């Protein structure tokens, strides 16, 4: 005789088929929304997310940062997060909407994309750079912003639009022409802002003054400096250009040489428990360890610098407060694969 518990289990399977199979996890709002299968972008789930993304679009045409755009916009949303290119804001929703618009043919998503694209193009400074926020807010937010790859993400998006790369084939000729011109001016400002030490070109700061192009401050612990992090994305963008100009070639080669000479060798970054029993980080001697790079380098000496909230430059990570050591990334392997990428680029350019 079948037991009562077995009968209950069978009944549950009948009334709830989902219990008999593994349900798919909902798609989170992050860069993963750009790497779904082609069929997914025409699904009801993709449309639902696209509808909420459109609902978050501002009057100006941009999007907020640090906001789950796959969820309904909150009435009490922080207006300070709106209209920015920081943390993949605006560029990520645009790339997502383009995929859904192409997959579904829905004019609503295409229109939201076009309005967002106009916002991106309107935000460009006459000299070719982009601020972190637009409309402008003042302070360091108005600087040309390479920080967290903001300008590089914008330029990569516009470059794809300009050539009609999928999923941007629905963009009309007028906007494509504007995108082409914007990329050209963007490349020009990148070349002009590359930091020069005498006759030697180096790399870039995470942010540059929009008028003088000098390396500029951001937050109290983000000084004018040579960036061992953001400069990597700039170099990769320059290497992505078809038929690079002689000036672009010089810029890439100079940056590659700077990265090679600025590596921190025989050192590892380790997490340990300090004397107070707290998790902490330090740089430790480690012969043969893979190279590391500092996020900030002195503009004159090229020495790594570490800065806490007191805005004082120090030569060692141990010299700043633990809160920053654990809460910010001062050292990393960002350019580790760059030598191989540069070598492949050289072969392509020589063809």
Task: Annotate each language-model stretch with its function.
Residues 1-5:
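Positively charged n-region of N-terminal signal peptides that target proteins for export
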Residues 6-15:
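Bacterial N-terminal signal peptides
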Residues 21-49, 160-185, 212-218, 222, ...:
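Terminal, non-catalytic domain-edge segments
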Residues 43, 47-91, 96:
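N-terminal carbohydrate-binding/catalytic regions of secreted carbohydrate-active enzymes
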Residues 48-62, 112-129, 180-199, 251-268:
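Long, well-ordered core segments of solenoidal/helical folds
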Residues 81-106, 112, 116-119:
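Long, hydrophobic/aromatic-enriched structural stretches that serve as scaffold segments
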Residues 110, 114-117, 121, 138, ...:
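Eukaryote-skewed repeat-based solenoidal scaffolds used as protein-protein interaction platforms
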